[in-house]
């Protein structure tokens, strides 16, 4: 999956690339990395292979994932699968990335996810968050992290 100015492009081996314009995305974007979750209700999930895929050993680099979303015109539920690299994904960062994508879509600014400069700035701010006090919702943590 590639985030571009005009929308998300799904690259699937052997088939033509599929462009999903930002205007079709509604209600946010969920992220699951790895497999093995049963749907916790959170927008960002890190399954068992997602956890193992960042550790040294035979699972390193395994456990791709998917972006899940509801599209309009026509209405449909979609999952766009992706491969992963062998870097470690902190559960906090997966959750905050999902929250960033969801809040950006909810604000009517889905196109910003295709703006490389803005996305780099936002992700850079989220990388500074390592944990947060119990009881704080990801939305509040995200808003505080992106505040100038």
Task: Label the model's feature ranges.
Residues 21:
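Acidic (E/D-rich), amphipathic helical modules within compact regulatory domains
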Residues 1-2, 11-18, 27-148:
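Eukaryotic intrinsically disordered, low-complexity regulatory linkers and tails enriched in Ser/Thr/Pro
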């Amino acid at each position: 999956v590639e985030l571009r100015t005009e929308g998300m492009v799904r690259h699937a081996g052997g088939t033509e690339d599929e462009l999903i314009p930002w205007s079709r995305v509604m209600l946010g974007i969920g992220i699951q990395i790895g497999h093995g979750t049963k749907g916790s209700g959170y927008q960002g999930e890190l399954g068992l292979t997602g956890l193992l895929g960042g550790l040294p050993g035979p699972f390193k680099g395994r456990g791709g994932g998917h972006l899940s979303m509801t599209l309009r015109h026509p209405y449909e539920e979609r999952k766009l699968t992706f491969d992963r690299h062998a870097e470690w994904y902190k559960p906090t960062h997966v959750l905050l990335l999902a929250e960033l994508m969801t809040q950006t879509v909810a604000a009517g600014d889905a196109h910003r996810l295709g703006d490389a400069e803005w996305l780099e700035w936002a992700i850079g701010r989220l990388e500074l968050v390592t944990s947060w006090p119990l009881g704080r919702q990801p939305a509040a943590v995200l808003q505080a992290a992106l505040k100038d």
